[in-house]
Swiss-Prot record:
Family the UniProt entry places it in: Belongs to the OMP decarboxylase family. Type 2 subfamily.
Keyword Membrane: no
Keywords of this entry: Decarboxylase, Lyase, Pyrimidine biosynthesis
Organismal lineage: Bacteria, Bacillati, Bacillota, Clostridia, Eubacteriales
Name of the protein in its database record: Orotidine 5'-phosphate decarboxylase
Any one GO biological process: 'de novo' pyrimidine nucleobase biosynthetic process
Amino acid sequence: MIIDKLYENVEKKGCVCVGLDTDISYLPKGFLNKFTNIEDAIFAFNQRIVDSTFDVSACYKVQIAYYEAMGIKGMILYKKTLEYIRKKGGIVIADIKRGDISATAKMYAKAHFEGDFESDFITLNPYMGMDTLEPYKDYFKNKEKGVFLLLRTSNEGSKDIQYLDLKDNKKVYNKVGEKIENIGKEFLGNCGYSSIGAVVGCTAEENNIRKELKHTFFLIPGYGAQGGKAEVAKSYLSEGNGGIVNSSRGILLAYKKYDEEGKNFEECARNEVINMKKTLQII
């Protein structure tokens, strides 16, 4: 199962997930000026980030919105970025946050687990109900695919719904977590984790999530630019595994800390990943 490959990558390379939420404003001006169009510039930037971090990162997360906003040319860029990572043997998470009834979900599954936009994992929103997961299950069983379901997200507005109190002294996200854990047991890999994972932001603490969701692998966003703390992120791991900690802007814009002109932006990105790994190990 794909979750075993991800688990092995974390064991070998560490738990950092590099987010390719690449905006044109992130590119150093000197680098951007070498290109005649935006799409080629962003793709070359993505390539150099991937190449420089490949041996020290568990996987990559590509946020589709940054590419959709560029229209058809942006979606071609998105396709090329996914392909580049996968052809190198890397694992890529398509951050698409889809969620819909079964007939529509079937098309989403086909769109993002096959063809032009094929990825290894995708993110889904389960708050329409767990029946929205049905069309994806064949891909878990037979086609080496997985998902991360939004459980408790890193944005401030997550408290509007996810944190609502229920009658049994639990919150909405606790109940959703129970469902994710139970459904996931059908798709366990040899590593003991399921190909159905959960998104758990590290901008707020919740010590019981890791204990309660023993078989659920976590995608942990919010580190760095969103204010998530390393000690919180590490609390969601189990002996350094069981999750991946994502950083996007913190890695892509790391050059601004050391090299404002960005002549060595990929080296700065690599150093940021290595520093993240060290911080998460030490705390």
